[in-house]
């Protein structure tokens, strides 16, 4: 048994403490709305129609709640004891309350004047309660609902949390589900479990979910093991992966390989010369997209319009715009100096990427991967049938698709091909519950679906096909139906005698 000292592992993401530092990736949370940003000094962030700077969150621990004050400054929110139900004056019935719009004495001009004076949202909510003629007549539950509604409107409270698979998957599913193929967060959790994602594995992943599945696998593996990502087009899309904020040590076990070179790798005709044109395309995509900071700035300006805009008719172009450079030291030519230095840096990156592609090809050629994860917008059948050859026997594979019919076809093809067992097509059912004192119940609105999963295990085929065995068993059953068993034939004459 090898000791842990022989294999030094990667350093933890936040050594020593859980404080927010300059350059970290964080997630801003307000009620049920999330947004992932990178912490930078004097960087203007727009979130939920409010703008502010992130300077004051540096040094605070994750989970701290801040209040947006005048001038875009964030101030830590002090926790105050809420009044208990015994001190509240509440009515017993809401039937006598008439909603005529005249119960509030404060007008919109009065509220605007309070905001202009710099009065905090908490004080505005308190004045709204005091100037409401029907507040004390409402039941205790109605009062809590009223206060919660007014706090959401007038109090600008933002909580800074650490990025995780669950938080980022909830964020993408709520704001831009098309970029992750409408994969719900519980479906992603099922994929990680069925795929047996753990530290030390050698995994293959083919996904077009903006890098969310890849980031979830990297988080669960903790920097131990290796992941080979197969990508279509000019380069891998890792916008969601960058939001995790993984350290550089996590990237040492991450490899990439173009999907259009898989057939040549299976046929044994793959060579290094075939990769000569690949890095040039990736560099041009990165050059056209700009850095991560420029991309996030443009996202902040168009934040509200993105959520309401229809999906693009060209998903490949839409995803290519999300490509993020893996090298944080890389700079655009306008920042790196002369054009000659930029060309040399570009050539160095191309050679380095070509080397990583060759390393990925060598890992795939061993055909001993510990698992396969497929979650793409393409038809799963040809992808799975070709990629299963790289997986070792007795290893799991999981395929995600937004629709059931492609997975049914894939299920049939796998049965005909053989070499797999325990095939299972599943769909998870998720329902959220409101859990509050004396009023816990399922929420009225719920998700209609989170996609479908096809899972199974690989086995050694021993050069045998599945079809003849299936047909022989079927023909045997048919012969038993048409002809009586021999034992029953012998018993019939004995009973007559």
Curated annotation (Swiss-Prot):
Binding site for substrate: 349, 377
InterPro entries referenced in this protein's UniProt entry, alphabetically: TRM6
Listed Pfam families: Gcd10p
GO BP term (any one): tRNA methylation
Chief place of localization: nucleus
Phosphothreonine, modified sites: 107
Keyword annotations of the record: Nucleus, Phosphoprotein, tRNA processing
Biased composition range(s): Basic and acidic residues: 79-102, 311-354, 478-497
GO CC field: nucleus; tRNA (m1A) methyltransferase complex
Signal peptide: none
Compartments in which it is found: Nucleus
Region called Substrate, residue ranges: 94-104, 145-154, 175-182, 415-423, 434-441
Coiled-coil region: none
UniProt-annotated stretches for the region Disordered: 69-102, 276-354, 468-497
Modified residues (Phosphoserine): 298, 305
Domain of life: Eukaryota
Subunit structure: Heterotetramer; composed of two copies of TRMT6 and two copies of TRMT61A.
Family: Belongs to the TRM6/GCD10 family.
Function: Substrate-binding subunit of tRNA (adenine-N(1)-)-methyltransferase, which catalyzes the formation of N(1)-methyladenine at position 58 (m1A58) in initiator methionyl-tRNA. Together with the TRMT61A catalytic subunit, part of a mRNA N(1)-methyltransferase complex that mediates methylation of adenosine residues at the N(1) position of a small subset of mRNAs: N(1) methylation takes place in tRNA T-loop-like structures of mRNAs and is only present at low stoichiometries.
Protein name, per record: tRNA (adenine(58)-N(1))-methyltransferase non-catalytic subunit TRM6
Species in which this protein is naturally found: Bos taurus
